[in-house]
């Protein structure tokens, strides 16, 4: 008999966690599992990528401002009972915070509960986000049969704040074959075919991604005569302020916001360098995908970076998590063709480790062990 599994996530927007959830549920063995994805809000560009054998449910049609504060007015049990209308063998909160609080409200002893943690909980504020307090977060996470972290760093940070909880590390699922196929498509953007050194980064235009730092570093390098073009793929709340600063710097032709693209891989694969300027990550999906397509990487030293790129920079450059660190890493790659060529070959080698089959099998083994 198939196990009924529910995955709960706030929405299916254009983020890394949302994308890897789609990859995972689409590839779970449907002869073993009856899979449902439920969002709190019926929004997000990733919904269309769910395969027909994955059921989709939305709690609310629209997302409203202040929802994270509003839900704290009610107990997890009250919200769960009003939101989840069926019984499941396993229910999964696929994102820390709100969904983790809600799923903890399931008191059916026959239902196993799993929480996924995608971010490095480096402060008490981050650890308690979505909960009334850190003590409530401890109580909620203690209700889970398993808490999954997407990297060892994420797990270690989680355990600094939460105790006596079963945890494990499972890497994200990437559609490696599909990524490689899409990387071959023609982006139709002329600058990718000239001799200019191209740098790219992918992510929501939000403060945690550090694109403001990347812009400052770009200006500094341009002023030093290190010519290159930066392409950012993504949308978000910082777009207006970034565009204003780009105009102030007079860099409209060399720091380009391309917006959201269904196929970022055709851009990333054609760039000379991928830069992760994030202030905080869990296990960067975008960096993983850059490695899969063989693009050299410079990443700030945030959670998961060394697991991806090596403790001693074997597969890419891990730099100090600061503007100066990003500057030093980019300058080295721009100035030293030998280093760049070395990391191009090492990126392709590391990318082979992220096979879809391996990561899906690890998740299925965890689900079957509950």
How would you label these PLM feature ranges?
Residues 296-299:
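Short hydrophobic beta-strand element within catalytic cores of glycosyltransferases
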Residues 101-103, 142-169, 174-178:
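A short, active-site helix/loop in glycosyltransferases that binds the activated sugar's phosphate group
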Residues 15-23, 197, 201-220, 226, ...:
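A conserved mid-protein helix/loop that constitutes part of the nucleotide-sugar donor-binding site
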Residues 311-323, 332-337:
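Conserved acidic donor-binding segment of nucleotide-sugar-dependent glycosyltransferases
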Residues 93-99, 117:
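Short His-centered aromatic/hydrophobic patch
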Residues 7-15, 19-23, 27-70, 154, ...:
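N-terminal strand-loop element at the rim of the active site
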């Amino acid at each position: 008999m198939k196990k009924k599994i529910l995955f709960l996530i706030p929405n299916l927007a254009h983020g890394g966690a949302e994308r890897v959830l789609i990859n995972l549920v689409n590839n779970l063995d449907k002869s073993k599992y009856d899979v449902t994805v439920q969002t709190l809000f019926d929004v997000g560009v990733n919904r269309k990528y769910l395969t027909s054998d994955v059921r989709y449910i939305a709690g609310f049609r629209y997302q409203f401002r202040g929802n994270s504060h509003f839900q704290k007015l009610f107990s997890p049990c009250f919200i769960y009972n009003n939101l989840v209308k069926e019984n499941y063998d396993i229910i999964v909160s696929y994102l820390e915070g709100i969904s983790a609080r809600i799923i903890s409200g399931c008191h059916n002893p026959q239902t196993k509960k799993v929480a996924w943690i995608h971010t490095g909980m480096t402060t008490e504020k981050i650890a308690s986000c979505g909960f009334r307090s850190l003590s409530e977060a401890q109580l909620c996470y203690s209700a889970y049969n398993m808490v999954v972290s997407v990297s060892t760093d994420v797990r270690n940070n989680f355990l600094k704040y939460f105790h006596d909880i079963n945890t494990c590390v499972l890497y994200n699922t990437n559609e490696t074959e599909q990524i490689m196929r899409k990387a071959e498509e023609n982006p139709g953007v002329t600058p990718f075919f000239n001799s200019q050194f191209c740098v790219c980064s992918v992510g929501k235009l939000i403060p945690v991604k550090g694109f403001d730092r990347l812009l400052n570093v770009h200006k500094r390098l341009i002023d030093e005569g290190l010519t290159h073009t930066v392409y950012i793929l993504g949308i978000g709340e910082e777009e207006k302020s970034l565009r204003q600063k780009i105009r102030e710097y007079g860099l409209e032709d060399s720091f380009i916001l391309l917006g959201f693209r269904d196929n970022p891989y055709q851009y990333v694969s054609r760039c000379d360098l991928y830069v992760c300027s994030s202030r905080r990550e869990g296990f960067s999906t975008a960096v993983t995908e850059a490695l899969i397509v063989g693009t050299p990487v410079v990443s700030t030293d945030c959670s998961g970076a060394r697991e991806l790129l090596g403790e001693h920079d074997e597969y890419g450059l891990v730099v100090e998590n600061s503007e100066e660190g990003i500057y030093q890493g980019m300058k080295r790659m721009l100035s030293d063709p030998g280093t760049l060529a070395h990391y191009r070959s090492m990126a392709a080698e590391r990318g082979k480790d992220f096979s879809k089959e391996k990561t899906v099998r690890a998740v299925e083994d965890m689900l079957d062990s509950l």
